[in-house]
Amino acid sequence: MDWLADQGATVDQRIDLLANRLVLIAPRGSDIAPFTPGDGTSIATRLGAGERLSVGNTDHVPAGIYAKQALESLGEWPALQARLASGDNVRAAMALVERGEAPLGIVYQTDAEASDGVRQIGVFPDASHTPITYPMAVVTPSPSAATETLRQWLAGDAARRIFIRYGFTPLTGD
């Protein structure tokens, strides 16, 4: 949305519609005990010799960028930077964990909840990374009635229930 505004697009009625969380995952059948990243338990100590932490590429994949921020914030980055298995997107990173090729991964909560092959073993503190939000705005100078109807529906209770079912946190609603 910021990029559109920077390019000169009219961005009106902007709201942050949804939020997501960053979670630590393991393969569904893993015996790794749940823990909260940042509670004093190191992620690096949960990895065996030669094992890697699966993340989206930390240079250009949004989930990977958030993962790097969280690991830096929690003081884990130096120990884990060389032990990352980088995926081209968050679903590729999750697939490495689903297949057991990586014992741990960092993905969005919504992706983890959509997979039968992984389980969440921890949630990163919200303060450890930039907020993960999904904005909505009208980007035309003269929005149609259909645009306004859709905007209102997306911010309403019916959409809110759907978003919650898929793991999002609605930031607005009736």
Language-model features: locations:
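Exported/periplasmic ABC-transporter solute-binding proteins
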Residues: 1-174
